[in-house]
Amino acid sequence: MVLIRVLANLLILQLSYAQMSSELVTGGDECNRNEHRFLVALYDPDRFLCGGTLLNEEWVLTAAHCDRRNMWIKLGMHSKTVPNEDEQRRVPKEKFFCLSTKNYTLWDKDIMLIRLDSPVSNSEHIAPLSLPSSPPSVGSVCRIMGWGTISSNKETYPNVPHCANINILDYEVCLAAYPEFVLPATSRTLCAGILEGGKDSCKGDSGGPLICNGQFQGILSWGNDVCGYILQPALYTRVFDHLDWIQRIIAGNTDATCPP
């Protein structure tokens, strides 16, 4: 377990931003089957690996650490065992990383853009998610979702995605929560969670979206091994900071590089 020491005044400050929730199950409740048309599942090759987000008919955004040689993508899925009629399967045609490499750290450049081998069509359970027009503010209530384990004590992977609401927190909270990683003073990541614990993304949710006001703001990168632990939020790659890179790659400028 990660050991943390947070000053009392920092906790009080952040509790003023955080909003209490009635959801008590780590990872939240089963998502409405119609609220995640953009959510995709990455497989490697026979086991579920990560989540991802559909940007348009040909492009998916996820975390760089989810990359595997033989991965494939399922779109339009709700239940792993009861398929939707409009589910589609694709494989990567191309993969793009920051600086044309797979180099990333716990706090920077954990982002991968995947071009599908053929376009997908919008349908009842498939549609893209909007990229952000501005960054989220501290205190924003955001939605997380995925097929990751709903308990970190005993890994339990659901057949259907679970959703929960969490808050954007000041980056200082994550600096205090993970001192052993020596995070930089500033970062292109978002710190998000519930300070009181109880709700969080978890193993298997990596690469999935953080959605604030209907816009795609973050990609789950990493968090504490004990999901939903008090005062230990997760970190998400900040999508807004990578907009130029994303848009240039999609437009055909494959030499585009991420922000420094």
From Swiss-Prot:
Q: Which GO terms describe its molecular function?
A: serine-type endopeptidase activity; toxin activity
Q: What is its main location?
A: secreted
Indicate the secretion signal residues.
1-18
Boundaries of each Peptidase S1 domain copy?
Answer: 25-251
**Pfam families assigned:** Trypsin
Q: Which GO terms describe its biological process?
A: proteolysis
In this protein, the residues bearing a glycan are N103
Q: Which SUPFAM superfamilies match?
A: Trypsin-like serine proteases
Keyword list, A-Z: Disulfide bond, Glycoprotein, Hemostasis impairing toxin, Hydrolase, Protease, Secreted, Serine protease, Signal, Toxin, Zymogen
Classify the source by domain of life. Eukaryota
What are the catalytic residues?
A: H65 (charge relay system), D110 (charge relay system), S206 (charge relay system)
According to its UniProt record, the EC number is 3.4.21.-
**Known partners and oligomeric status:** Monomer.
The task this protein performs is described as:
Snake venom serine protease that may act in the hemostasis system of the prey.
Q: What is this protein called?
A: Snake venom serine proteinase 4a
Record the organism. Crotalus adamanteus (Eastern diamondback rattlesnake)
